[in-house]
Amino acid sequence: MDGILIFLLSYSPGQYLVRAMQRNHLPLALALIQPDETVGDDFEELELTVNQGIHGSQDNANALLRAGIPCIYFAGSRLNGELKEFVADFGAAAKTVRQLQSMKIGIIGKLPGMGDVVTDDMAVYRRIGPEFVYDSIGTVTKFCDTVKPEEVAERVAYERTVFDVDPKMPPERHAEAVRMYIGIKRYLEANDYAGYTIHFDEFGADGRYTQLPLLAASSLMADGYGYAAEGDATTAMLMAAMVQLCGEANFSEMYMMDLKREAILLCHAGEGNYATARKDRKPFLMDRVFNEGGLSNPPTPIFAPEPGPACVMSLVHTEGETFKLVYSRGEIVDKCDLRKCDMPYMFFRPETGVRPCVKAWLEQGGTHHETVVLGEYENRIRMLCRLIGIEFVSV
């Protein structure tokens, strides 16, 4: 069981709900609906009393609030589809709360000096649920060494149906990227991780790798794993949570304000969830010159996501067990013709405008790594924040 949903059709004393809910550890929601959705001109006291659910709902909501028990509320029609949507959103949020309690995120390395990725692991564990587990690059290497050539060949053949592969790509370079993908996936599966973060310098310093795992990160995001770069376990956790809650998510960062387009260019070193790519063209798998880590060219998927409604968010740890979700709703702009951007990228147009959004992002301490969700899921994201005690801040 993931949660409890109360349908309060008539009056119920709120005081008597408190004891049971103090013993309850499941997410809670209360939906106020009525047998009749309009007041009849000839209603007598019986009809009015039968439809008096608002009376009991107020009593119960007040009692829950004063007891410090979080609850999600609905008031509306049971006939026009809005109740069905509420139940779906609450069910997804409640299930995500449960999954967060057992979630694990793998961590290998961290970029020194990057302050906004630093958090208190135990505060995350107590307030939100996931466990951050620290591993070594040797652990990943062990799993990569188990990958067989025939497994690599099968995956390479599959990827040639997914991507337009750069004709300059040496076959052995693509094969090595695939070997790393399969190995890292086995590392995640063996440890039951919902997501991971790796600092790329670990691969250059190790001496056993010839390229950075950009394709691996992109493919694992497409498989449904949470991800963030540079040891940012918080964003990897947030992405994993959004995958559970919304079905799909992406990792990126704000690269540049585009004041002319009233948009923000988002991209990262070369990772992106190509399952979100626009449907009218294949992603391009590029034999890309990239000097970070001091290694050879990493095969890099280049694409832009499907245009339409979207949101960009960041989980901020302020102090103690206090967290807030900095959230911007807007749209992915239909722009995918940057000629020399050798990374997955997107133009995000905030609903509030680029200047107010970015200014408020700074004021709220929003981090430089973000999770991106395509579609309209704000209701269930707000529910999740309320259920786990995180402030939702719209910018």
Question: Could you tell me what each predicted segment is?
Answer:
Residues 2-10, 29-31, 193-199:
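Periplasmic-binding protein-like
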Residues 12-15, 37-38, 80-82, 112-116, ...:
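Flexible loop/turn segments at secondary-structure boundaries
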Residues 18-45, 50-56, 218-231:
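Short, acidic/small-residue loops that bind anionic groups at enzyme active sites
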